[in-house]
Amino acid sequence: MGEFRTSYVIDPPNGQIPRLAEPLYDLERKNFRYRYLTGIGDNSGPEALPLAERCLIGFGNTAGPGMMGTLYNSTYQFIQTPDHVAIIVEMAHDARIIPTYASAEEARANRRPDVLEQWFGDSVGWYEGDTLVVETVNIKPLQMQQRSVPISPSGKIT
């Protein structure tokens, strides 16, 4: 059985994300100024719209990595084959297809090249007893810009 936590953050151990070198509101202000000066903004084309509004991925990190429920459409369907686990998310019909291996070492050795950035990152899985462990790296930077839980480009979620 797991442990009760007050935070999704496990590193640092106190569960508190360190302060940003530059406060987020300053970054948002700079982003607004850039939009104002260049004309590139919410009305300039679909690329400027949020990913969920473009139906590329669901909002609220429903499909992960770090799968978080939202107020509605939080149903997940798990499909398991001998060498894959698929997690189908009701919100925006996102799907995570996770290859599974005999061990963590084998899983990590079979990762996709970093140049292949995918929505929801590169996930591999293995079983420890009857527990499925999923490790995700190489999360698409564009997806990271709109996350509620910040993750660095070199971050890893297990």
Where do the PLM segments sit?
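PEST-like low-complexity, intrinsically disordered acidic/proline/serine-rich tracts
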Residues: 1-158
